[in-house]
Amino acid sequence: MLEQLQTLKNEAETQINEASDLKSLNDLRVKYLGKKGPMTEIMKQMGKLSAEERPKMGSLANEVRTALTEAISSKQQILETEAINEKLKSETIDVTLPGTAPSIGTKHLLTQVIEEMEDMFIGMGYEIAEGPEVELDYYNFEALNLPKDHPARDMQDSFYITENTLLRTQTSPVQARTMEKHDFSKGPIKVICPGKVYRRDNDDATHSHQFTQIEGLVVGENITFADLKGTLTVLAKTMFGEEREIRLRPSFFPFTEPSVEMDISCFKCGGKGCRVCKGTGWIEILGSGMVHPNVLEMSGIDSTRYSGFAFGLGPERVAMLKYAVDDIRHLYTNDLRFTKQFQSTETGEI
């Protein structure tokens, strides 16, 4: 048994020293020190020895087990250190290599269209008015001639937060708030109201549950329909080209009377008829009209003395028509490949 223990020790230590990875080392531990290993078998045979031999052989067996355990532990530390060093080496970053340049953002197409319209109206003497996106039901509907039982409320589904508050469905509430607090001793009202609006539409190529609007409002003495037509003509020619013609069609909006929708001559075919204008030669752009007397009175304005006009359009629609964008969702995906198509790298302009 003495020779057997010595042979086992030499053989095991040789294999432990030659182990190249932690898995191989663990296999050797199981092989020599496991429940079915030779060391266990030797310990079981101790009972067959004489009383004189048993202490000596037991002590030697324990020394061999201890030596193998220490050899495995020492080798394990070496292999773990080597593994860590190899990992660090493979993950080393060469700081002298050129870095990956971050993608540079550009001004969004929708932002550019909105700013273009804002600049145009500011040049015409308009001011920019803003209001809350979480709006009172009163300003979103009732102040705009849509009482609680008005059938026109069924024309648009809304995101209600409480019984009396909702995400505004239009920027018209800003007009109502502006009229309510305006002091005509300082001049007429002349504002545009750009901002986000929300409706319960299913998102598709032409609809979005969140989009933007720009509405305009002018209220003062002797404001006529001719003033509205002149303003819309300037808007059409500025945004779509000097050669554009406009057409006004009778329509209905609860907050204006009379109400009209404005079409422009197709910029693609020049009015001859094509896919863009659906063969009609005209493209619908916006809704407008003279401010309804009820709306003026609700805001505390004397409708026998003051009159006004209002209009509203969607910058998304303008952008899609002007730059041939076929899906409104492209405007909201934050894809730089899309955005950069509409911006000059030198001037930052469209």
UniProtKB/Swiss-Prot annotation:
Keywords: Aminoacyl-tRNA synthetase, ATP-binding, Cytoplasm, Ligase, Magnesium, Metal-binding, Nucleotide-binding, Protein biosynthesis. GO terms for molecular function: ATP binding; catalytic activity, acting on a protein; magnesium ion binding; phenylalanine-tRNA ligase activity; transferase activity; tRNA binding. It is an enzyme of class 6 (ligase). Its cofactor is Mg(2+). It holds the Pfam family Phe_tRNA-synt_N. Its EC number is 6.1.1.20. It catalyses: tRNA(Phe) + L-phenylalanine + ATP = L-phenylalanyl-tRNA(Phe) + AMP + diphosphate + H(+). Binds 2 magnesium ions per tetramer. Mg(2+) binds at E257. GO terms for cellular component: cytoplasm. The keyword Cytoplasm applies. One of its GO terms (biological process) is phenylalanyl-tRNA aminoacylation. InterPro entries: aa-tRNA-synth_II, aa-tRNA-synth_II/BPL/LPL, Phe-tRNA-synth_IIc_asu, Phe-tRNA_ligase_II_N, Phe_tRNA_ligase_alpha1_bac, Phenylalanyl-tRNA_Synthase, tRNA-bd_arm. It is found in: Cytoplasm. The keyword Glycoprotein does not apply. Its main location: cytoplasm. Tetramer of two alpha and two beta subunits. Belongs to the class-II aminoacyl-tRNA synthetase family. Phe-tRNA synthetase alpha subunit type 1 subfamily. HAMAP family: Phe_tRNA_synth_alpha1 (MF_00281). This is Phenylalanine--tRNA ligase alpha subunit.
